[in-house]
Every structure is written in structure tokens, then in C-alpha cells.
């Protein structure tokens, strides 16, 4: 029984030694809660870069949406003008029979 407990303790110590040899750490003391002088500057800067990218994407989406709305309005106006001209051509034909479109097709 003592032998198995001794082996278990030695195994635990061996695991701790191997685990600690594979990792490393550094403690940096500073006056306040800000990151120390050896902190990763890229990590602090990347959040600002992401915010700028998101602003650009948002502005681009807004511009595309505005242009699509403008294009839709132009298409609707052109369709309305086309329908009005077809109505006028039907009235000029007397309204009897089939409607004639501006290109002469039925």
C-alpha cells in the first residue's frame, strides 16, 4: 500500500515538473491596471483596426443600399411612363380590339 502511494506521489511530481518545463510565464508589475511596457501592442491596436473596418463595411453597405433604392425608383418611373404611353396608344386606337404597343406588337 505504501509503495503504491509513493509511486502515485512520484508520478504527480513528475507530471508537474514536465508540465512546468513546457510552459513559461513572466510577471510584470505596474503602478495601475494598464498593460505593461512589454505587453503585446498588436493586441491593443487590433481592436481599433477592427472598428475602422466595421465602419468602412457599414458605410459601404449604406451606399449600396442607397444606390439600389435609387435604381429601383428609376425603374419604377420608367415602367410607369411606359404604361402611360401604352394607355395613350390604346386611346388613340379607339380602345377597340387588342392593344397596340409602341413597337407595333400585340
UniProtKB/Swiss-Prot annotation:
Propiece residue ranges: 39-106
Cell location: Secreted
Modification type Alanine amide: residues: 35
GO CC annotation, single: extracellular region
A GO molecular function held by the record: hormone activity
Annotated site, Cleavage by prohormone convertase, chain positions: 38-39
Family: Belongs to the AKH/HRTH/RPCH family.
Protein name: Adipokinetic hormone/corazonin-related peptide
Organism per entry: Aedes aegypti (Yellowfever mosquito)
